[in-house]
Amino acid sequence: MGLLTILKKMKQKERDVRLLMLGLDNAGKTTILKKFNGEDVDTISPTLGFNIKTLEHRGFKLNIWDVGGQKSLRSYWRNYFESTDGLIWVVDSADRQRMQDCQRELQSLLVEERLAGATLLIFANKQDLPGALSCNAIQEALELDSIRSHHWRIQGCSAVTGEDLLPGIDWLLDDISSRVFTAD
């Protein structure tokens, strides 16, 4: 029995999943986390550092790391990569000006060895705002079709209303579960 098999079996018992939520500043990462946890989202301030929430969902114990996206904090993102099962990349669909910056940052994450194998969920947030780019437009702008190193999906959503957060999280958990948790 190899080390990987032993680790998978240990994780199977706990059904622990580590999710890392990243994206540019003001994309809505903290709002998504709070909404998913049933917390009030009326007063959200920029994350200077990180938030960690541990939640139960569908029999999984989710450890969600929400890391600030300001330019000055991005160099610290690599400190959170270890043992990540799923990467949630949050995009502000209404911020057309920073789509290229968003694409560049995402592509730099996808070549990180410590994120190899992590499932990628892209939340195209703020779909409720006028002028928000469609998922197809974001998929093209971020060059998602070129991603071969990770299983990925783009999911339109609104963190403020909570619309379509669950389908994204459920897909992410299904994909991680099929890779990490083996049947005995």
From Swiss-Prot:
Q: Which UniProt keywords apply?
A: Cell cycle, Cytoplasm, Cytoskeleton, GTP-binding, Isopeptide bond, Lipoprotein, Mitochondrion, Myristate, Nucleotide-binding, Nucleus, Phosphoprotein, Ubl conjugation
Q: How is it modified after translation?
A: Not N-myristoylated.
Q: Does the keyword Ubl conjugation apply?
A: yes
| Compartment(s) of residence | Mitochondrion intermembrane space; Cytoplasm, Cytoskeleton, Microtubule organizing center, Centrosome; Nucleus; Cytoplasm
Top-level taxon of origin: Eukaryota
Describe tissue expression.
Answer: Expressed in brain, retina, lung, cerebellum, liver, kidney, hippocampus, spleen, cortex and heart (at protein level).
**Which GO CC annotations does the UniProt entry carry?**
centrosome; cytoplasm; lateral plasma membrane; microtubule cytoskeleton; mitochondrial intermembrane space; mitochondrion; nucleus
For the cross-link Glycyl lysine isopeptide (Lys-Gly) (interchain with G-Cter in ubiquitin), what are the residue positions? Answer: K71
* Entry coiled-coil feature ranges: none
Q: Which residues make up the binding site for GTP? A: 23-30, 66-70, 125-128
SMART domains associated with the record:
ARF (SM00177), RAB (SM00175), SAR (SM00178)
Q: List, alphabetically, the Gene3D superfamilies matched.
A: P-loop containing nucleotide triphosphate hydrolases
Chief subcellular location: mitochondrion
GO MF entry, a single one: GDP binding
The record's note on quaternary structure and interaction partners says:
Found in a complex with ARL2, ARL2BP and SLC25A6. Found in a complex with at least ARL2, PPP2CB, PPP2R1A, PPP2R2A, PPP2R5E and TBCD. Interacts with ELMOD2. The GTP-bound form interacts with ARL2BP. The GDP-bound form interacts preferentially with TBCD. Interacts with UNC119. Found in a complex with ARL2, ARL2BP and SLC25A4. The GTP-bound form interacts with PDE6D.
Instruction: Give the protein name, as stated in the record.
Output: ADP-ribosylation factor-like protein 2
Q: Which organism is it from?
A: Rattus norvegicus (Rat)
